[in-house]
């Protein structure tokens, strides 16, 4: 089965190149023709510096075949409209995107089930495209159908794939870590509050796990690569858009204007909208996410949010909110 990669941003392009170098047949779809031409003619991409891209690119969705494995690598808020445009139903879907659809509160697996109803798997973990492109050691988690077969086809000497059975946990961990990373970036913008950042990341994984377990996720998923692994890299890496977004907020930039002017999607800023709606409907305590929402959408001063988190009622540590 051929891989049809939907999305030629940094991660979609790098992942397509992994597959191609593994001997797989791959087609990479890009929305813009100029990106397609760069990849096909110059073998370069504006999203992947200093790497030769040797996959074939197209901007024609009609090229997808029903035998293909569709790899989703576009922002979550645009997945539905692209799936509805597909001329055929693919043999299965492998999702690389991280987030929750705002208007429905659905995870990507639920969107795929609703529209395509085909086998589904999700790949997640600490995997910034910039490092994978340089073939630096990376390990990720794959959950879902046909995971053992996909594990063999995707893994390389530098890209190690583990499997698990918890699709819900892997999806939720990947989505919510972006929200916590915005808060981590705010602390970075304050000038390196190491104690506070360690506490934030620790309490953040509890918050993510609490949300996920409400929907049936396995607690141990959040202690693995898809959970604490991805959270750590997103909260600390210079490549993290969500962390950088929070850092700029702390330095005085208007968050809504930042979102308008950004040429890359800050997924956590959209995910937090969906998370807070779901949390309120189900009475799930999400104190960090709530403060991120207030800073981004209600104009609350970030320093005040940090203070309010510290002033919450005292609790036991383990699995307390």
Swiss-Prot record:
Active site feature: 177 (proton acceptor)
Pfam families registered for this protein in UniProt: NAD_Gly3P_dh_C, NAD_Gly3P_dh_N
Residues holding sn-glycerol 3-phosphate: 98, 125, 127, 177, 230, 240-242
Keywords per UniProt: Cytoplasm, Lipid biosynthesis, Lipid metabolism, NAD, NADP, Nucleotide-binding, Oxidoreductase, Phospholipid biosynthesis, Phospholipid metabolism
Pathway(s) annotated for this protein in UniProt: Membrane lipid metabolism; glycerophospholipid metabolism
Gene3D superfamilies: N-(1-d-carboxylethyl)-l-norvaline Dehydrogenase, domain 2, NAD(P)-binding Rossmann-like Domain
Broad class of enzyme this protein falls into: oxidoreductase
Chain positions recorded as NADPH binding sites: 10-11, 31-32, 47, 98, 129, 241, 265, 267
The keyword Cytoplasm belongs to this UniProt entry's keyword annotation: yes
Cell compartments where the protein resides: Cytoplasm
E.C. number(s) listed in UniProt: 1.1.1.94
Broad class of where this protein is predominantly found: cytoplasm
Catalysed reactions, as listed in the record: sn-glycerol 3-phosphate + NAD(+) = dihydroxyacetone phosphate + NADH + H(+); sn-glycerol 3-phosphate + NADP(+) = dihydroxyacetone phosphate + NADPH + H(+)
A GO CC term attached to the entry: cytosol
An individual GO BP term: glycerol-3-phosphate biosynthetic process
One GO MF term attached to the UniProt entry: glycerol-3-phosphate dehydrogenase [NAD(P)+] activity
Family (UniProt): Belongs to the NAD-dependent glycerol-3-phosphate dehydrogenase family.
Function, as annotated: Catalyzes the reduction of the glycolytic intermediate dihydroxyacetone phosphate (DHAP) to sn-glycerol 3-phosphate (G3P), the key precursor for phospholipid synthesis.
HAMAP family membership: NAD_Glyc3P_dehydrog (MF_00394)
Protein name, entry field: Glycerol-3-phosphate dehydrogenase [NAD(P)+]
Organism lineage: Bacteria, Thermotogati, Thermotogota, Thermotogae, Thermotogales
